């Protein structure tokens, strides 16, 4: 299972590991937001972090790479793609975003949030709450996203941006889905399909000038 270190989490859930970017940097500047989902995020993120301490917990994982080339310059694609708000109306499951905390330590901008989703599960739709943290490195044009939701599904994402030198940009989403063996294929297939749909919607709206 591929994991990416969490540089900044809620203070009640521990501090960054020694040697991590946040541990070396100055104290981050943070803004806290009060909302109805904040305690839920904190409790769920504690479960997520506990799971990270036990990577051999019996769950299965599937890794996918989802590259897409967008006919627009790197800076344009980066600014649109790394903005969570542009997911709304384009990610097929996503119905809302609730931000709990934003931090900036000079190297990374960190956003703690809950994604409100309607997830299709056969004949029914499951109202999921995905607890997540996005870490953005603007200087090096990449970001990571860590998320956890019921029933004990973890997703690790590394999104990178490559200037192709011809006015186009290739974005690759390297995603690791982790779930119980009975759910892993469904989780990976559903997750990959939703990300492809989101990528294609972003590509279209960047190239046609909507974004």
Question: Which residues fall in each region the model found?
Answer:
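Hydrophobic pocket/interface hotspot
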Residues: 77-81, 87, 134, 144, ...
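A short, structured loop/turn motif at beta-sheet edges
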Residues: 71-75, 102-107, 135-141, 160-170
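Glycine-rich portal/gate segments that line the openings of hydrophobic small-molecule binding cavities
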Residues: 55-57, 99-151, 205-209
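Intrinsic-disorder/low-complexity, polar/charged segments enriched in Ser/Thr/Lys/Arg/Asp/Glu/Gln
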Residues: 61-69, 110, 129, 156, ...
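Beta-strand/loop substructures that line and gate deep hydrophobic ligand-binding cavities in soluble
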Residues: 146-196
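C-terminal region of N-terminal signal peptides and the immediate post-cleavage residues
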Residues: 8-27
């Amino acid at each position: 299972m591929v994991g990416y270190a969490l540089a900044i989490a809620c203070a009640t859930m521990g501090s960054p590991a020694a040697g991590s970017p946040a541990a070396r940097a100055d104290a981050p500047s943070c803004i806290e937001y009060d909302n109805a989902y904040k305690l839920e995020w904190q409790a769920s993120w504690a479960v997520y972090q506990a799971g990270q301490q036990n990577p051999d917990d019996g769950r299965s994982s599937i890794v996918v790479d989802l590259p897409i080339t967008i006919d627009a310059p790197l800076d344009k694609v980066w600014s649109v793609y790394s903005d969570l708000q542009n997911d709304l109306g384009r990610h097929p499951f996503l119905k809302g975003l609730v931000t709990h905390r934003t931090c900036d330590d000079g190297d990374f901008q960190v956003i703690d949030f809950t994604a409100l989703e309607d997830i299709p599960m056969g004949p029914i739709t499951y109202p999921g709450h995905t607890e997540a943290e996005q870490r953005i490195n603007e200087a090096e044009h990449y970001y990571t996203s860590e998320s956890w939701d019921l029933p004990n599904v973890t997703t690790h994402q590394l999104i990178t941006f490559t200037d192709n030198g011809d006015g186009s940009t290739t974005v690759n989403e390297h995603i690791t889905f982790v779930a119980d063996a009975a759910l892993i294929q469904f989780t990976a297939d559903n997750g990959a399909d939703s990300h492809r749909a989101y990528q294609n919607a972003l590509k279209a709206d960047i190239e046609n000038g909507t974004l």
